Amino acid sequence: MATKTLKVTQTKSSIGRLPKHRATLTGLGLRRINHTVEVEDTPSVRGMINKVYYMVSVEELG
């Protein structure tokens, strides 16, 4: 069974943001603006994305 993945792209800078939000971006594997990573679609990852929703864009992959 194929697992669902999400394509997460950082769209805004982390400079001047809350330290916990910066740590969340690091936890997602994002380093800079326009950096894109593919992550597994799990509740914990969804929670991380919801925390920094204003700095990332998300696409669902099959």
UniProtKB/Swiss-Prot annotation:
Keywords: Ribonucleoprotein, Ribosomal protein. One of its GO terms (cellular component) is cytosolic large ribosomal subunit. The keyword Ribonucleoprotein applies. One of its GO terms (molecular function) is structural constituent of ribosome. Signal peptide: none annotated. Belongs to the universal ribosomal protein uL30 family. Part of the 50S ribosomal subunit. This is Large ribosomal subunit protein uL30. It comes from Shewanella frigidimarina (strain NCIMB 400).
